[in-house]
Amino acid sequence: MAERLGILVGGGPAPGINSVISSVTIEAINNGLEVIGIYDGFKHLVEGKTNMVKKLSIEDVSRIHIEGGSILRTSRVNPAKSEETLEKTVQTLKKLGIKYLVTIGGDDTAFSASKVCERSKGEIKVVHVPKTIDNDLPLPENMPTFGFETARHVATELVYNLMQDSRTTNRWYFVAMMGREAGHLALGVGKAASATITIIPEEFKEGVTLEEVCDVLDGAILKRKLMGRDDGVAVIGEGIAEKMDPEELANIPGVIVEKDPHGHLRLAEIPLATILKRAIERRYAERGERIHIVDVTIGYELRSARPIPFDIVYTRTLGYGAVRFLLGDYSDLPGGMVCVVGGRIKILPFDAFMDPKTGRTKVRVVDVRSEDYRVARKYMIRLEKKDLEDPETLEKLAKLAKMEPEEFKKKYWHTTELP
């Protein structure tokens, strides 16, 4: 009887998942394995269910590599939330006859995979294929996580369309961009689309207030107005909400602060662009003016997009590498994560990305001291020190804000500071 390899997907969707499933299935079958697709991540495994699976054939997967979404669906169920659920998961996998397990997911799924591998005590060899459109896993040599490049490509087109609409209708757009703790997607999209301003969580300190974030946006709007323009697009990393005080967020009418099974804030339930829009509108109302702002959130539109060639090529290599590792190539580790380093497949131990202080996966954040960030910032419209140090410019900006020059300088100086 052929040995069994199981595949499951955890976390949010990302372009390229089906390509991984396809390449894993084809390589595994070509090496004599039976491939079992497990539906809905760990959801049914933690309940002991063995019927939510499908035997995959090459015919099932031969053309899915160009499609978005996941034929196995996905879920955020965390099998490592307790000793009982972890043990149940391992026992269910054993009942299914799974000897090899391929997990596809982000940092939470990687953590779950490592715990399953550890609990199985060598009976199930586990390999994790890291994915997230947030690009926040610290892969070697700064390689992107699969799905990121497609997400940036699709989102850039959307933001470019909004920029054209902004110019045509003489209004501002506040665009919240997916990215829990890191601003890679927001910055990449803003830079590629030449958005008026992009703000990301990495540029703010912990506990940043709504007022301080609004100062940055308001400063950009005023400077743009001084240049004769009442239009613009601000790309806003949703992870900024993670930097804010949850109590302040909870006190905003209409905002519900909840956490997911992994303990993260449900950022999708926090309408950051709307919150910032209303706060800026209140400022302008206090000045006796009206400003036209449209709030947009971009995220779900990207996750199941058809992958661009970069992500298809990348994921086929990752899927192939995952199977080769399980069959004994590359490393003798009982489990690990597959990645590409310098064009070559490499297996890293699960703890390679672990933060010893937290016991959780490290997060790759935007390096705000890098040339990449500095270049992006150079092409934004935002207040700079020279604007506030030049008496003539300062006076004009203060007049627009209906403030005294020194009052304006004191309030907005913090927005000119580089992180």
UniProtKB/Swiss-Prot annotation:
Marked site positions, Important for catalytic activity and substrate specificity: 108
Pathway: Carbohydrate degradation; glycolysis; D-glyceraldehyde 3-phosphate and glycerone phosphate from D-glucose: step 3/4
Binding-site residues for diphosphate, renumbered to this chain: 12
Catalytic activity, EC: 2.7.1.90
Pfam name, any one: PFK
Subcellular location: Cytoplasm
Reactions the enzyme catalyzes: beta-D-fructose 6-phosphate + diphosphate = beta-D-fructose 1,6-bisphosphate + phosphate + H(+)
Modes of activity regulation: Non-allosteric.
Identification of the protein by name: Pyrophosphate--fructose 6-phosphate 1-phosphotransferase
Membrane-spanning parts: none
Residue sites binding substrate per the record: 132-134, 178-180, 238, 300-303
InterPro entries referenced in this protein's UniProt entry, alphabetically: ATP_PFK, PFKA_PPi_Ttgales, Phosphofructokinase_dom, PKF_sf, PPi-PFK_TM0289
Record note on pH: Optimum pH is 5.6-5.8 for the forward reaction, and 5.6-6.8 for the reverse reaction.
Root EC class: transferase
Cellular component GO terms held in the UniProt record: cytoplasm
GO MF annotations, alphabetized: 6-phosphofructokinase activity; diphosphate-fructose-6-phosphate 1-phosphotransferase activity; metal ion binding; phosphofructokinase activity
PANTHER family per UniProt: PYROPHOSPHATE--FRUCTOSE 6-PHOSPHATE 1-PHOSPHOTRANSFERASE (PTHR43650), PYROPHOSPHATE--FRUCTOSE 6-PHOSPHATE 1-PHOSPHOTRANSFERASE SUBUNIT BETA 2 (PTHR43650:SF1)
Cofactor entry: Mg(2+); Co(2+); Mn(2+); Ni(2+)
Similarity remark: Belongs to the phosphofructokinase type A (PFKA) family. PPi-dependent PFK group II subfamily. Clade 'Short' sub-subfamily.
Keywords: Cytoplasm, Glycolysis, Kinase, Magnesium, Metal-binding, Transferase
Cofactor note: Mg(2+) can be partially replaced by Co(2+), Mn(2+) and Ni(2+).
HAMAP family in alphabetical order: Phosphofructokinase_II_Short
Site residues (Important for catalytic activity), renumbered to this chain: 131
Residues annotated as the enzyme's active site: 134
Subunit-structure text: Homodimer.
Function according to Swiss-Prot or TrEMBL: Catalyzes the phosphorylation of D-fructose 6-phosphate, the first committing step of glycolysis. Uses inorganic phosphate (PPi) as phosphoryl donor instead of ATP like common ATP-dependent phosphofructokinases (ATP-PFKs), which renders the reaction reversible, and can thus function both in glycolysis and gluconeogenesis. Consistently, PPi-PFK can replace the enzymes of both the forward (ATP-PFK) and reverse (fructose-bisphosphatase (FBPase)) reactions.
